[in-house]
Amino acid sequence: MNQMVSLTSILEHNQRFVSEKKYEPYKTTKFPSKKLVIVTCMDTRLTELLPQAMGLKNGDAKIVKNAGAIVSHPFGSVMRSILVAIYELQAEEVCIVGHHECGMSGLNASSILEKAKERGVEDSCLNLLTSAGLDLKTWLTGFHSVEESVSHSVNMIKNHPLLPKKVPVHGLVIHPETGKLDVVINGYETELINNHS
């Protein structure tokens, strides 16, 4: 592996970037100008595509990334980030943006655990985690339908006891080649239904 080559290259580029003041066009505040927090996937195809497809530029939104755009625990780091964005950083809406052809679709925990063993993680470590109550197979399992996964995450956020009831939570799926967005859940419509019931 060429870790040192990558880090060296990054640091060389960074030195030029700073000395040539290439950061100037990216200056903004920590507050998202579009009052939006987005949870999306770490897929490399979305790095530039997603902001372009959503009409976002630097400073418009808080973007939280993880494997699969999944909110897997109501008190995990993703949910904490959403709450911080809302209460401390002036975000007023949440978008979960999953994508087609996601690596988390059909992810098999056994495959990951085998690869971990091949790279030096010992059975004794896995056994210790299991005996401590961690269900590795569930924790490392993906989803079967991106739409269902997005809906599940939206519902977990929307029903969180610390989320203000008036915050719209949208669920979208993006195509990683074209950037086409499909709406799974329109948070405005959900809000209208809740206000009339």
Swiss-Prot record:
Q: Where does Zn(2+) bind?
A: 41, 43, 99, 102
Organism superkingdom: Bacteria
Quickly give the catalysed reaction: hydrogencarbonate + H(+) = CO2 + H2O
Query: What Gene3D superfamilies does the entry give?
Result: Carbonic anhydrase
Q: What cofactor does this one take?
A: Zn(2+)
Q: What class of enzyme is it?
A: lyase
Instruction: Describe the function of this protein.
Output: Reversible hydration of carbon dioxide.
Q: Which family does it belong to?
A: Belongs to the beta-class carbonic anhydrase family.
Q: What is this protein called?
A: Putative carbonic anhydrase YvdA
